[in-house]
Amino acid sequence: MPRTEEANQRIREERRGQILDAASRVFARKGLAGTRIADIATEGEMSQGLIFRYFASKEEVFAAVVEKALQSATSLAQAALQQPCSPLEKLRWLLQIYLPGMWYKPDYALVMLYALNSEDTPQEVRELALEQSKLTLQLYRQLIVEGQEAGEVVQGDPDMLTLAFAACIQGLSSSVLHLPRTLGVDGSPDPEIVLKILKA
């Protein structure tokens, strides 16, 4: 029996996701300039032709990986705001998901940081990254302000506290490939360490 359009769409989405996952690993190691479509195909154990069925160039793949990473970060912050708990518990919930995910599968986070900081990043991708990052920071700020109003987060300039919180998370993301081995660390960071920055 022929597959339904719904089944075909699901297969297309799965294959696209497989391409992006493989690409995220390669871009995290090699950057945009050092990556070829052939590298992504080898990493994902797929043909170059399959990749070109979904993307016209490696730049398109890179943009899609960055978009997925940014949307994941924003969606997590939005979900944290909706949790039925206190503001500090919302922040803890966010970190309990984000930190292990970033620690054990760091590729998307590393590509996101690369997109924000590398001169190789196409201008339109950089603008998308900056805009989406701004939205995520606004959500972090909202969580912090709620915490201040509840007396759970230290008083002070919420913009500076947001900066410190985001910088801590990004610092962990950027160091995940080398610092754990250097320090002999086993396991993802304890959310409580990050929360100490904010606790009243």
Residue ranges and their predicted role:
Residues 109-113, 123-126, 130, 148-194:
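Hydrophobic/aromatic-rich alpha-helical bundle segments in the mid-to-C-terminal region
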Residues 29-33, 83-84, 105, 150:
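Short coil/turn segments at alpha/beta junctions that flank glycine-rich nucleotide-binding fingerprints
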